[in-house]
Amino acid sequence: KRKLRHSLGRPSRSDFVQPEIISIIWNAIRTEALLYPIKEKTVKKERILGVPEGLPISNTLANIYMQDIDIKYRELDYISYYRYVDDILILVNEDKFFDVKKNICDDIKKLGLELNDKKDEGLVTESFEYLGYVLNDSEVTVRKSSVLKIEQSIEELFRTIKKDNIGYLQWKLNLKITGFILESHKYGWLFFYSQITDLSLLFHLDDVVQKLIKRYKLEGKIIIKRFVRTYAEIHMALHETKYIPNLDDLKLEDKKAILSDIYQMDLTDKDERFVEIQFHKIMKREIRDIEKDIENIS
């Protein structure tokens, strides 16, 4: 992890940035931080270093702060440089390794950032992790803890959803398997891990779902989609598929049916605006639920 100095709040290129935008950024960075553990009287402290995690603009701020380093190292033809927020992956030939390592460490420290002591380095012939993926010379798969997390999340649905609301269980489970598209953005576990090549993992997850259906005596009562099919649709027919829900294509009547039949919401005498607001609110909640399955990927 790295800590961003508050100089980011006052961009050097302020001539090109509206003062109102600079003010918003600065106020966001200085957001009060809670001191844990939370007691009866919550103690707050003004943030003096770093950007709050989970802030809508946190990733954007990181991109702004790191843009010069990104440009410098992406232009080098003897390395492959990748960065996702605060996780950096560099692929380089062994003879250049120590020079590149020293240079990027120096550049990062010049920005006032702190390198995480937990750094991984090694040969690409060995297995290594990046963003929850496990990469080696034969395949790309998902690390065991991330697989366990989605398995536990699926089982929790079976445990907590009452059997008298089978439609809700089927809907939630299928969303977890296929993910969905909303406002042109893709959400879901398999969307995040769509670059895997380890198809045996997907067959394993489908098998886990079938075993849970059998354990909870739901054979023939619910129609569940498959990870294997979803993976194929993502790679071969994403823009035409009906298998993965594109909620942007739903008509008003479709949204009403989902709200009333699945979420058991009374829509009597409710107008179109109410339906749109409630549907959007519920699907934002589903996004938060799905994103829990891919949290803590660093």
PLM regions: where:
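Polymerase palm active-site segment centered on the conserved acidic dipeptide of motif C
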Residues: 80-83, 91-164
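Conserved polymerase palm-domain catalytic core
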Residues: 1-85, 89-103, 113, 122-127, ...
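Active-site and adjacent loop segments of nucleotide-processing enzymes
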Residues: 135-298
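A sequence-level detector of short, solvent-exposed, charge-rich linear segments
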Residues: 23, 27, 40, 44, ...
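A structural signal for alpha-helix termini and helix-coil/disorder junctions
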Residues: 6, 10, 14, 27, ...
